[in-house]
């Protein structure tokens, strides 16, 4: 969720979304520049559901079941980041629609978006499933003590 105006609609969207996922800038704007961990837990405590933030090359952080998790992505040569967020959200939704767990969906989305950033060309830079499935093995999920 990119929320650069901090509109009141964002609270309604969060309430109604099954899996709200923010961009780093969107989360900072929405929660008035709190550190991302505190912001995620505040939203989780308000909604009692999964909430995440994408942080580019620093990966993805999320809270579910009152625990903080991190999906670390490998360092890659970035060529183009345009639409990386859209690719992430689309891949995440696709994985959820296939009844994947939240963690599996994060892995799939992070791998897909990371690979997309390694090429230019809009829709033509979205990687093939076989490439994503190999690349997923390079990603790591960690439960963070908080």
Which residue stretches match the model-derived regions?
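Conserved beta-alpha-beta core of the PfkB/ribokinase-like small-molecule kinase fold
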Residues: 1-41, 59
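Conserved phosphate-binding/catalytic region of the ribokinase-like
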Residues: 36-146
